[in-house]
Amino acid sequence: MSNVASKPVQLSSDIKFNVTDNTIHIEGPKGKLEFVKPDEITIVQTDNLINESTKSESTAMSGTTRALLFNMVTGVSKGWEKKLSLVGVGYRAKADKLKLELVVGYSHPVNFEIPEGITIETPSQTEIVISGIDKQKVGQVAADIRSVRPPEPYKGKGIKYADEQIVKKEAKKK
């Protein structure tokens, strides 16, 4: 068994955990998530811990399953969040309930549809906060927004993650 899979996932008292056939249902204060587990992995709940047992040939999948379960439990209890910042003169963002409008140096504003289960806030014109209960979905939406105008290496203009360090290149010299 992998090192990751050997650690149990801790459940808090406000989280409901249920396994039916191969589908895992986790419900918490922020919402509910479902996950279809692989056939060769068996999930057992004892008190407030989730353990898994596996056959020897599927150790990699057991570690992945444990990580996905942990992300689901954390998502329905605390939620996930990614922060983006806009760097550049005149770059700004404005969020409504259904769309995010980005002005990032193109001749037109870029409209980004907000998927279901994701909330996007703009505390200031140059900050975007993406939050939700599904870690994969939050990360994918953040990557999609960043891909509208990724940071360029000479001046650092573009949309970047809040904690991302842009390594700047030196301009050509004659």
Q: What does each model-found stretch correspond to?
A:
Residues 2-143, 147-161, 165-174:
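N-terminal intrinsically disordered, cationic/polar leader segments
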